Amino acid sequence: MTTPPFVWLISGCSTGFGREIAISALEAGDMVAVTSRNTEDIRDICNKYPSTSVALNLDVTYTDQIIECVRNVISKFGRIDVLVNNAGYGYLSAIEEGEGEEVSKLFNTNFFGALELTKQVLPVMRNQKFGRIINNSSQAGLMAN
């Protein structure tokens, strides 16, 4: 088992829970790969914690970006102890009114993006014989309103 400080890879850190989880982990003394589709949105976090964080561009709908991100985390920190699948967004519409293209885009981000990121990180965790994966979702995905 790995002991602290832990190495975190967190998707979707520009706002909300992803941002707060990244800051909390850094304040606890852990190392964090802070990701966003636009690294300017997370630059302030990494400027505050320059030796224990790295800002990485990541759009989870692109497998090549996921692969590159995981490689960069391993290159910077040597391992990944905690993966937080947080990237995602909501689409407010009744299911029968949802536009096919928009619903497809939502699933590509919220489900398939997390799945692909997990697929790329799992071999790393298996190799190091330790790892935790946290999947963040919306209450709307669990309970109808």
Predicted regions and their residues:
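The beta1-alpha1 cofactor-binding region of Rossmann-like NAD(H)/NADP(H)-dependent oxidoreductases
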Residues: 58-68, 100-101
